[in-house]
Amino acid sequence: MVALSIVGSATLLFSCGKDTKRTVVDYETLMTESSENRTITMMENGMRSYVFTAPLVEGYSLAKNPYQEFRRGIHLTTFTSDSLSLEDATIKANYAIYYENQKLWEAKGNVVIIKKNRKEGDTVVTGLTEVYSQQLFWN
């Protein structure tokens, strides 16, 4: 038991050398936020404006151009401005990035936009407008 204590103490003393290395932090790639299965509901004037869902959100707020990255895709549902629950359009993509300073979104990979067409003030959907793309920008 005494021998084990001496060996342990010797190991501890010799393992604490002066090989301290400094690590340089690259703020452009330093993740400051990570969230899984995030859902955000945006309200304007008491009315639901949109619901945003992402399986993974990673934020880089210390970068020169701060951004949020959605590497596992996004799903966005917008609502008509005159209703609490009437869906207006949906956007889905495999990947997205949001540049905070420019307030600019970029979606990539199997981007699908589906817009529900209605006559003004009506709740009946008269048709759908579908757009398929590999990339979409909006602000």
Question: Where do the model's predicted regions map?
Answer:
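Terminal module of membrane-associated proteins
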Residues: 6-7
